[in-house]
Amino acid sequence: MPLFLSLGLYMYMKKLFGLSRNALLILALVGGLLLGYFFVLPFTAEQVASVIPRSSEKLLGDAVYAALQEEGDSNGSALLTAFFDSLNVVTPYSIRITLVDDKTVNAFALPGGQIVVYSGLLKKMKSYTELAALLSHEFIHVEKRHATRSICRSLGSQFFVGLLFGNMGSLVSVAAGHANEIRSLSYSRQLEKEADLSGLQLLLDRRIDARDFADLFTRLKEQESDLVIPEIISSHPDTDVRAAYIKKAAAGQQPVSHPVLNHIFDQLKKLYP
């Protein structure tokens, strides 16, 4: 904990409560340690995480996915990966997309290139443009290291100690032990907006109709009752606000048809109508 914060806390407590010098020093020290644990360490871990090699990110993501024990549909996974490959996205990451046959309405990205899509979400989709929007959004979480940064911030001091001593094996073990928590991680509004707008730009560059990006989330929100909220909606707040700025950014677009993407999507919908 920075010395100036502890000293500041010491002076504040002395003035407020008139405690003895030793008592104030102990309180200031404890307070400083708590502030450091909850604020400084998570922030530092997130910054250091930005320099983790991509090969180590892959190890991390693979370990978390293995710990989740999700069984992927090989045919569906191959089709999803072929769909993403057809977007011709240039990236240093090897993107691997797994389709899990589960009613959960969700998708999430893991460090190093792993993206997981549940069939419950695929069944809600009406067009290839919606799938393109979803995968573009999740890809940005990988490309911008949102998943890695959020994991480091969530695990705080445990991750920081591993990073400090260069113990990647320890980091992988810690992350795998928190796999279920990691699957449910929510990103900050700033990171979600970055994924929205950067993912949207991928669609615009390929002249894929981007309006369906906002429509998908709006429709999911409207279709579900208050008792059954899709996980992808509950973990992505401010859906109406996001739909509005996505539609604004996509205004004036002149999309073209993409028969290859449409064909792959049709094959997926035959598996999961």
Residue ranges, per PLM feature:
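A Zn2+-metalloprotease active-site environment signal
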Residues: 2-273
